[in-house]
Amino acid sequence: MKYIQTEQQIEIPEGVTVSIKSRIVKVVGPRGTLTKNLKHIDVTFTKVNNQLIKVAVHNGDRKHVAALRTVKSLVDNMITGVTKGYKYKMRYVYAHFPINVNIVEKDGAKFIEVRNFLGDKKIRNVPVRDGVTIEFSTNVKDEIVLSGNSVEDVSQNAADLQQICRVRNKDIRKFLDGIYVSHKGFIVEDM
């Protein structure tokens, strides 16, 4: 079944400006700027005023309508990122061999370096994405905090770190060692 026209509305809070030119969305807010290329998705953007944008699909089937809702979610996440920011807390879990995590710089790029995972001599490196800041928690032992404006970059960095510490060829019910996401939240908390 084809839908003649389906549209979603995106509300823009005060202090945030959204500019759209040939399906490249640029969101500027108090925490910074985010840009997303949406040329591959066939949607129409209409700026009603400075507080409202309409996103529409004409003669679309279920897949196009689903893509419309995806575009709305992506832009909403960008608006949240430039106003509140995203923060992921990760904890190291180990039974015997303590995991050692450091931040190193090689050739101008930052890496998260994981040593002594399950007693391995192998050094695991995870590249840090642009716009993601990493710090170690001062009041909680064995915790690392990833924060940034883009939820895609922060969550992908957390997933990369969790995946590189996956236990292979052992019973994962017994070998629970790894680095896991313990909390997902915002940098600027609502009062």
Curated annotation (Swiss-Prot):
GO terms for biological process: cytoplasmic translation. GO terms for molecular function: rRNA binding; structural constituent of ribosome. Keywords: Cytoplasm, Ribonucleoprotein, Ribosomal protein. It comes from the Eukaryota. InterPro entries: Ribosomal_uL6-like, Ribosomal_uL6-like_a/b-dom_sf, Ribosomal_uL6_a/b-dom, Ribosomal_uL6_CS2. Transmembrane segments: none annotated. One of its GO terms (cellular component) is cytosolic large ribosomal subunit. It is found in: Cytoplasm. Disulfide bonds: none annotated. Present with 76000 molecules/cell in log phase SD medium. There are 2 genes for uL6 in yeast. Component of the large ribosomal subunit (LSU). Mature yeast ribosomes consist of a small (40S) and a large (60S) subunit. The 40S small subunit contains 1 molecule of ribosomal RNA (18S rRNA) and 33 different proteins (encoded by 57 genes). The large 60S subunit contains 3 rRNA molecules (25S, 5.8S and 5S rRNA) and 46 different proteins (encoded by 81 genes). Belongs to the universal ribosomal protein uL6 family. Component of the ribosome, a large ribonucleoprotein complex responsible for the synthesis of proteins in the cell. The small ribosomal subunit (SSU) binds messenger RNAs (mRNAs) and translates the encoded message by selecting cognate aminoacyl-transfer RNA (tRNA) molecules. The large subunit (LSU) contains the ribosomal catalytic site termed the peptidyl transferase center (PTC), which catalyzes the formation of peptide bonds, thereby polymerizing the amino acids delivered by tRNAs into a polypeptide chain. This is Large ribosomal subunit protein uL6B. It comes from Saccharomyces cerevisiae (strain ATCC 204508 / S288c). The lineage of its organism: Eukaryota, Fungi, Dikarya, Ascomycota, Saccharomycotina. The gene is RPL9B.
